[in-house]
């Protein structure tokens, strides 16, 4: 865990191309262990994305003054590792909604417009009662906190 970490927003990752090669080059450039196997590259990506999500949630909290206790994930919910890593990194419960959350949201808005659903709260209740909602609890917070500090240093110096 945490052997290789990247900044998902790094400029070299923004255009199509050989991403594993670019990740390896980034890790070499930043003095980290270079991931060699597909599994090491995938873990690097998953952990790094989870830290980026934490940075984003904390930034939203700073801007709004609100504290968010739950992270809701729509797309990407099929990747259980990303969901668990996000819970671990953010130190928040991750709640996953339906796979087709965008389409379902559209249906809810249309039902509201037609008067079949009173308001957004009722729409949320309909979704909760109609689809499996899985939650992921944070684990190993101290390890993830230490690795988050390491990640922030890596991306600052990249």
Where are these regions (language model features)?
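Active-site core segments that coordinate phosphate-bearing ligands/cofactors
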Residues: 1-70, 78-102, 108-158
